[in-house]
Amino acid sequence: MTILDDILVKTRQVIARDQASVPAAELVAAAKDLPVCRDFHGSLAATDQVRLIAEVKRASPSAGLIREDFDPPTIAKSYEDGGAACISVLTDEPFFQGSLDYLRQVRSAVDLPILRKDFIVDPYQLLQARVAGADAVLLIAECLSPQQLIEMDEQASELGLQTLIELYEPENLAPVLATKTRLVGINNRDLRTFETDLQHCVRLAADIPSDRLVVGESGIRTAADVAMLKAGGIKAILVGESLMRQPDITIATKALLAS
């Protein structure tokens, strides 16, 4: 069993637990009175500069605990002050020590568009995201069949949520492009082994049509990395761990975007 297989087993257990606590019907009712979502794609497409999705991330399977003084609202505000265009909040509990409560806290702290980053395999998680205050959700091609990708993208749109659809394997690019998403994420980390290669997204970006905005994910640490990705056609980046480890997140965010 790969790491990803294990993650998906645990994810389905968490979904079952949550559904027993809060039925989908309650979330559907709660979602009806919510304000319109912020424009996640628009925030990333606003300028020709590489735009940053800054991630609120407590831990990971590969790195363990990333930051001791973990206060999601403070971290998100630091990202906003540093020039981030959007915020990503990791909500996976078993492997990343995340929580939907963190997303709710961040929503109350900043006005930037927010992404729920999790291993989304069930429409129930889309409802959770919308009610918690997310404006967009991450879908992962390696976690869903081509038909499921299309259906989940459509269901997210019906809730007013935008999607960032991520892939690692080149053969998953066609299924991603078969959806209506405008945001295609290329993960430099193989979710099966957790090894990273920063050039991976540059190689795949060449095959993505210009009407899709490409987001580079994982392994991005320096302004030089950002400059290299920009030269390779990457329009936005998602960065978490390297910023979360810095003593002053605002200064680190500004430095990363200085390219």
UniProtKB/Swiss-Prot annotation:
Q: What is its EC number?
A: 4.1.1.48
UniProt pathway annotation: Amino-acid biosynthesis; L-tryptophan biosynthesis; L-tryptophan from chorismate: step 4/5
**Reactions catalysed:** 1-(2-carboxyphenylamino)-1-deoxy-D-ribulose 5-phosphate + H(+) = (1S,2R)-1-C-(indol-3-yl)glycerol 3-phosphate + CO2 + H2O
What PROSITE patterns has UniProt attached to this entry? IGPS (PS00614)
What are the alphabetically sorted keywords of the record?
Answer: Amino-acid biosynthesis, Aromatic amino acid biosynthesis, Decarboxylase, Lyase, Tryptophan biosynthesis
Give the Gene Ontology MF terms in alphabetical order. indole-3-glycerol-phosphate synthase activity; phosphoribosylanthranilate isomerase activity
Pfam families referenced in this protein's UniProt entry, alphabetically: IGPS
Q: Name one GO biological process term.
A: L-tryptophan biosynthetic process
Identify which top EC class this enzyme belongs to.
lyase
Q: Does the keyword Amino-acid biosynthesis apply?
A: yes
Q: Which InterPro entries match?
A: Aldolase_TIM, Indole-3-glycerol_P_synth, Indole-3-glycerol_P_synth_dom, Indole-3-GlycerolPSynthase_CS, RibuloseP-bd_barrel
Lyase: present as a keyword of the record?
yes
Here the disulfide bonds are none
The entry assigns this protein to a family as follows: Belongs to the TrpC family.
Protein name in UniProt = Indole-3-glycerol phosphate synthase
